[in-house]
């Protein structure tokens, strides 16, 4: 009831203005362990059936918040309290940048979807690291999503990723290389096997922490499989599928720029993930994101081969109860099918 009133107010505002107001509140809450514990007591959910050890990290549950919500690692404590099993901060770039011109964030309410053309707006790696350390330690694993600065030419992209990774080496539990945002000109061109190979070979020499590649949903299947194979061969520990889509046919009234996320992406993301899992299940940790908004969809992705999940748009539309609702219902679905834990259900459809 309370969130429905708050949502009505927030949805009367420009989408980015609303997000900024929420961020201010969450940052304030993150400064208070007492308030975070209060949130956790109301909206958190813990069940040993949902716990898992992946890549040496303990995940209280498989449901994470995708990168883009907390761009500067300034409200992670509060977000964890809403029931997430892990979070991904960023996208951080080597240097601070403003991103694209506003308006750049839009709602497609009937489709429960978002369209964003943000352009990696963030305070830069130095301030992101400072903020992360200020609020540490954290109760769940935290990933750091890394991107390329807009002004960096393609020929120097590898150096730029090396620079931002180097600044972030002392924070986070894993790193995700974002080559798939549609909002940085030509960034998706880096989704090729040669660059991906160079990128992960470079990163493996710099850190022993897990490394992930986040891919776009708009790749041709053969291209996607080739790129992922290159990443895994070069040392990637996991693949996150997928980022936002540029397929404007998925909503009734799309804006000219920006990637789409939310329920409009459910089918497309699921189909991409299915192909990914058929080829690489048991070879890599697979993370499914895109259009997940309830336990049924979450469970389907897990049975398809997802060790972990991420949400974003559904959190905007459904509010603070979402994690708790998904996780409670997920436990029921596991029990109904005779699984003793979520770990047993991963890849069940492939066995």
UniProtKB/Swiss-Prot annotation:
Bilayer topology term: Peripheral membrane protein
Known cofactor(s): FMN
Alphabetized SUPFAM superfamilies for the sequence: FMN-linked oxidoreductases
Residue numbers annotated as active site: 181 (nucleophile)
Cofactor note: Binds 1 FMN per subunit.
EC number: 1.3.5.2
This protein's UniProt keywords: Cell membrane, Flavoprotein, FMN, Membrane, Oxidoreductase, Pyrimidine biosynthesis
InterPro entries the record matches: Aldolase_TIM, DHO_dehydrogenase, Dihydroorotate_DH_1_2, Dihydroorotate_DH_2, Dihydroorotate_DH_cat, Dihydroorotate_DH_CS
PROSITE patterns (alphabetical): DHODEHASE_1, DHODEHASE_2
Family statement drawn from the similarity comment of this UniProt entry: Belongs to the dihydroorotate dehydrogenase family. Type 2 subfamily.
HAMAP family documented for this protein: DHO_dh_type2
Subunit structure: Monomer.
Entry-linked PANTHER family: DIHYDROOROTATE DEHYDROGENASE (QUINONE), MITOCHONDRIAL, DIHYDROOROTATE DEHYDROGENASE (QUINONE), MITOCHONDRIAL-RELATED
Function, in words: Catalyzes the conversion of dihydroorotate to orotate with quinone as electron acceptor.
NCBIfam families membership: PRK05286.2-2 (NF003649), PRK05286.2-5 (NF003652), pyrD_sub2 (TIGR01036)
Name of this chain's protein: Dihydroorotate dehydrogenase (quinone)
UniProt organism field: Helicobacter pylori (strain P12)
Native organism taxonomy: Bacteria, Pseudomonadati, Campylobacterota, Epsilonproteobacteria, Campylobacterales
């Amino acid at each position: 009831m309370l969130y429905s009133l708050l949502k009505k107010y927030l949805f009367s505002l420009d989408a980015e203005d609303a997000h900024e107001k929420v961020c201010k509140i969450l940052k304030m809450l993150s400064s208070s362990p007492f308030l975070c514990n209060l949130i956790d007591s109301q909206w958190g959910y813990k069940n040993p059936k949902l716990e898992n050890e992946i890549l040496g990290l303990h995940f209280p549950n498989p449901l994470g918040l995708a990168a883009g919500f907390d761009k500067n690692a300034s409200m992670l404590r509060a977000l964890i309290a809403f029931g997430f099993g892990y979070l991904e901060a960023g996208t951080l770039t080597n240097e601070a940048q403003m991103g694209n011109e506003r308006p750049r964030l839009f709602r497609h309410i009937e489709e429960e979807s978002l369209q964003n053309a943000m352009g990696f707006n963030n305070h830069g790696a130095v301030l992101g690291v400072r903020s992360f350390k200020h609020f540490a330690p954290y109760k769940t694993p935290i990933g750091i999503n890394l991107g390329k600065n807009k002004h960096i030419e393609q020929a120097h992209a590898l150096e730029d990723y090396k620079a931002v990774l180097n600044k972030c080496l002392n924070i986070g539990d894993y790193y995700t290389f974002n080559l798939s945002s549609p909002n940085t000109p030509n960034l998706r061109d880096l989704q090729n096997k040669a660059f991906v190979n160079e990128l992960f070979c470079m990163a493996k020499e710099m850190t022993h922490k897990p490394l992930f590649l986040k891919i776009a949903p708009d790749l041709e299947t053969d291209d996607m499989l080739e790129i992922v194979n290159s990443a895994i061969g070069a040392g990637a520990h996991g693949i996150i599928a997928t980022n936002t889509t540029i397929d404007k046919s998925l909503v009734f009234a799309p804006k000219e720029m920006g990637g789409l996320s939310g329920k409009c992406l459910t089918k497309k993301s699921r189909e991409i993930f299915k192909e990914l899992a058929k080829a690489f299940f048991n070879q890599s940790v697979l993370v499914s994101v895109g259009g997940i908004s309830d336990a049924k969809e979450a469970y389907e992705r897990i049975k398809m081969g997802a060790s972990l999940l991420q949400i974003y748009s559904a959190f905007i539309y459904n509010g603070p109860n979402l994690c708790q609702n998904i996780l409670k219902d997920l436990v029921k679905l596991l029990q109904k099918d005779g699984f003793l834990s979520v770990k047993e259900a991963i890849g069940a459809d492939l066995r």
